[in-house]
Amino acid sequence: MTNIRKNHPLMKIVNHSLIDLPTPSNISAWWNFGSLLGLCLGIQIITGLFLAMHYTSDTLTAFSSVTHICRDVNYGWIIRYLHANGASMVFTCLFLHMGWGIYYGSYTYSETWNIGILLLFMVMATTFMGYVLPWGQMSFWGATVITNLLSAIPYIGTDLVQWIWGGFSVDKATLTRFFAFHFILPFIIAALVMVHLLFLHETGSNNPTGIISDADKIPFHPYYTVKDALGFLLLITLLLTLVLFSPDLLGDPDNYTPANPLNTPPHIKPEWYFLFAYAILRSIPNKLGGVLALVLSIAILAIMPFLHTSKQRSMMFRPISQTLFWILVADLLTLTWIGGQPVEHPFIIIGQLASFLYFFLILILMPTCSLIENKLLKW
């Protein structure tokens, strides 16, 4: 009898991707975050679909429809908070996934890495548009401030902003189009994830040592499916704890006030996962310079393969590079803290120093350090 798993055209693809996939035998828990992101995407699409059934993208009724979901729809409150806090889980896993990629030198798989960066940009765009939909104060003013940044682009900036708004300010047209894009983008992200995996399976997974492990591979199932299942359990436990005990912990109280174009909140700030980029944006007094720094803070990841000067792929056996990596992590945490603070002394100078250090570490210190470590290998 023929084995359907190995011979059926569709099952064969699943088999080669999830069951008989040759996987390095020494990959650690850091390799769990890819599958956790897949779980998060699934949760977000399902909860988002149910929310979209009850949400109305009209400036007059958007806020009320979200209230209606929480009060009147069966289990609407849990669906809404799973979706809102699910976004925080997505970014927690994303940052850890990227951090591990940098630490273990996975960016040398340039196709997989570049599609990952494209995915990051798309996830950030989707999340930003989703934050606008409840039409609270922070939704409205966040949309106004962030879209207004495009006006810094010379010559076409003002026209571009009005084109995105669909008028002369953030209004009904803006909300409707943001809802449309917020709905469609996760499906495009899901398709890109498939391409991300396609390129990954062309080369095979990296491992903590950074050394080619073709001589020592084990099947993905059952060894890593069980490991992923444990990760799923921990992630769902963490998400449900957050949703059931303190669902508004990561939100902004201002978003429980309906949007009012005549009343500006005292501190306009995005969700916690954008604060590091927001701090970099604010640290440069010039508007265009700030926007460029904001884009480059993410786009800089694309040149990481070209900045890799070490003879070793992973940082596992490179203590000086490890130190710089953890300084970079501390710097990003500092930027996240600064992004949530008001624009006043001493936060301005701390933000500027942290922003400078971020670029200096990635562009100068880490490549230089790798060259020094290469010299030390000969001693």
Curated annotation (Swiss-Prot):
Pfam families in the record: Cytochrom_B_C (PF00032), Cytochrome_B (PF00033)
GO cellular component, one term: respiratory chain complex III
Record GO terms (molecular function): metal ion binding; ubiquinol-cytochrome-c reductase activity
Main location class: mitochondrion
Cofactor(s) required for function per UniProt: heme b
Residue ranges of the TM segments: 33-53, 77-98, 113-133, 178-198, 226-246, 288-308, 320-340, 347-367
One biological process term in Gene Ontology: mitochondrial electron transport, ubiquinol to cytochrome c
Residues reported in the UniProt entry to bind heme b b566: 97, 196
InterPro entries for this protein: Cyt_b/b6_C, Cyt_b/b6_C_sf, Cyt_b/b6_N, Cytb/b6-like_sf, Cytochrome_b, Cytochrome_b_C_euk/bac, Cytochrome_b_N_euk/bac, Di-haem_cyt_TM
Subcellular location as annotated: Mitochondrion inner membrane
Chain positions recorded as heme b b562 binding sites: 83, 182
Cofactor note: Binds 2 heme b groups non-covalently.
Role description: Component of the ubiquinol-cytochrome c reductase complex (complex III or cytochrome b-c1 complex) that is part of the mitochondrial respiratory chain. The b-c1 complex mediates electron transfer from ubiquinol to cytochrome c. Contributes to the generation of a proton gradient across the mitochondrial membrane that is then used for ATP synthesis.
Subunit structure: The cytochrome bc1 complex contains 11 subunits: 3 respiratory subunits (MT-CYB, CYC1 and UQCRFS1), 2 core proteins (UQCRC1 and UQCRC2) and 6 low-molecular weight proteins (UQCRH/QCR6, UQCRB/QCR7, UQCRQ/QCR8, UQCR10/QCR9, UQCR11/QCR10 and a cleavage product of UQCRFS1). This cytochrome bc1 complex then forms a dimer.
Note: Heme 1 (or BL or b562) is low-potential and absorbs at about 562 nm, and heme 2 (or BH or b566) is high-potential and absorbs at about 566 nm.
UniProt name for this protein: Cytochrome b
Protein's gene: MT-CYB
